[in-house]
UniProtKB/Swiss-Prot annotation:
Membrane topology listed for this record: Multi-pass membrane protein
Cross-referenced InterPro entries: UPF0060
HAMAP family: UPF0060 (MF_00010)
One family name in Pfam for this protein: UPF0060
Subcellular location: Cell inner membrane
NCBIfam families: PRK02237.1 (NF002586)
Name of protein: UPF0060 membrane protein Nham_2004
Domain of life from the UniProt record: Bacteria
GO cellular component, one term: plasma membrane
Amino acid sequence: MITSAAYVGAAVAEIAGCFAFWAWLRLGKSVWWLAPGMVSLALFAYLLTLVDSEAAGRAYAAYGGVYIIASLGWLWSVEGLRPDRWDLTGAAICLLGAAIILFGPRQI
């Protein structure tokens, strides 16, 4: 349960943090947008340390699937652009890869 919550929280924190930089550089928002953006990015990094995984790289790779879903949700809910069929097809392919990483049998 904590892994799922950590992944979702990390995705929201990462997207919000990166969007703060996007807003500053691309949308002409105040430089003050960077302060909460940096806090969000630090929170993102911390939350990924809570994931139950024996290897950081595997945790990050599996997180990629969560990030993609969260990014498409952000695209639709915050930016007002509905994901198209290519967004959804690409996401499905990536989610399959993330599932293989997460649930594949491991040699111990």
